[in-house]
């Protein structure tokens, strides 16, 4: 079933009875994932600092299936409150999607990067998922089940695709994911991350200074996988659905790359030719 489909039949729904918190859930990948999770039967807490967008999304999804909380992922109190809100409103927490992220200023040289900017990117992109994982595990461990997912990046495995701060944060996030999986597996909790290539989202538009069409054209041209078109936020949502659902019941400690093979191919070698 395609991520963007308007309806999912009852027998095909993968998250019936599940409760999820999605940080950065008001727009981009987070909003696409919230919509898909609800289509598959989940109840979703949208956690974000974009209050108007969050309220609009919840109005779209409906109050029985969703709720919005203001959440700055660098503030531990906010993250703990988002998790507690999910439990208070919907009775439990099954899925934590640490999706909030920032790209930071486009610093092309270390000499142009400030310590404050570097630390801000790490605070959101690395400390945020740490806090989300910590507090999700707090309520998941007694239940002996749960799936924790974080949004990493193509930059978690290749260099030269983003700033030093962003690349560092995503490399470190993969390491944290693996270590957290090692600790939490004994409690029945799976921990994974998703690493997309460039996808047209508000974050990408701001970082690249381009519109959706230009971003998609660049990524489609650089992609190793041809004929599939441009990577969409819906594709990332579908990957998160796999990891959140019982389809991924034995998958933990993994970095699921959704990049059409871009991260494993060095096209400059030119060995494979038509």
UniProtKB/Swiss-Prot annotation:
So what EC number does this one have? 1.1.1.295
- Domain of life the protein comes from: Eukaryota
**SUPFAM superfamilies associated with the record:** NAD(P)-binding Rossmann-fold domains (SSF51735)
Q: Which reaction does it catalyse?
A: 3beta-hydroxy-9beta-pimara-7,15-dien-19,6beta-olide + NAD(+) = momilactone A + NADH + H(+); 3beta-hydroxy-9beta-pimara-7,15-dien-19,6beta-olide + NADP(+) = momilactone A + NADPH + H(+)
What InterPro entries does the entry give? ABA2-like (IPR045309), NAD(P)-bd_dom_sf (IPR036291), Sc_DH/Rdtase_CS (IPR020904), SDR_fam (IPR002347)
Keywords, alphabetical: NAD, NADP, Oxidoreductase
- What do we know about what induces or represses this protein's expression? By chitin oligosaccharide elicitor and UV irradiation.
What EC class is this? oxidoreductase
* Cysteines joined through disulfide linkages: none
Extract the Pfam families matched here.
adh_short_C2
Annotated GO MF terms: momilactone-A synthase activity
What else does the entry mention about this protein?
A: The phytoalexins momilactones A and B are diterpenoid secondary metabolites involved in the defense mechanism of the plant and produced in response to attack (by a pathogen, elicitor or UV irradiation). Momilactone B can also act as an allochemical (an antimicrobial and allelopathic agent), being constitutively produced in the root of the plant and secreted to the rhizosphere where it suppresses the growth of neighboring plants and soil microorganisms.
Indicate the family of this protein: Belongs to the short-chain dehydrogenases/reductases (SDR) family.
What the protein does comes down to:
Involved in momilactone phytoalexins biosynthesis. Catalyzes the last step of momilactone A biosynthesis.
Q: What's the protein here called?
A: Momilactone A synthase
């Amino acid at each position: 079933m395609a991520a963007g489909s308007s309806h999912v039949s009852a027998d095909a729904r993968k998250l019936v009875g599940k409760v999820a918190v999605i940080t950065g859930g008001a727009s981009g990948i987070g909003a696409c994932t919230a919509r898909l999770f609800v289509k598959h039967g989940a109840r979703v807490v949208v956690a974000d600092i974009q209050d108007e967008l969050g309220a609009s999304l919840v109005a779209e999804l409906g109050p029985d299936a969703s709720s919005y909380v203001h959440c700055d992922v660098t503030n531990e109190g906010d993250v703990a409150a988002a998790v507690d809100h999910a439990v208070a409103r919907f009775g439990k927490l099954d899925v934590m999607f640490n999706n909030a992220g920032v790209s930071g200023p486009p610093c092309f040289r270390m000499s142009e990067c400030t310590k404050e900017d570097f630390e801000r990117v790490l605070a959101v992109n690395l400390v945020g998922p740490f806090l989300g994982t910590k507090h999700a595990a707090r309520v998941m461990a007694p239940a002996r089940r749960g799936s924790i997912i974080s949004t990493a990046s193509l930059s978690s495995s290749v260099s030269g695709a983003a700033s030093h701060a962003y690349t560092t944060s995503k490399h470190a996030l993969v390491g944290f994911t693996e270590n957290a999986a090692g600790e939490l597996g004994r409690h029945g909790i799976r921990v994974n991350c998703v690493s997309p290539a460039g996808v047209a989202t508000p974050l990408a538009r701001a970082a690249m200074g381009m519109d959706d069409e230009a971003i998609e054209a660049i990524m489609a041209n650089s992609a190793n996988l041809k004929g599939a078109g441009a990577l969409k936020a819906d594709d990332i949502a579908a990957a998160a659905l796999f990891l959140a659902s019982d389809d991924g019941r034995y998958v933990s400690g993994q970095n699921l790359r959704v990049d059409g093979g871009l991260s494993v191919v060095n096209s400059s070698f030119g060995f494979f030719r038509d």
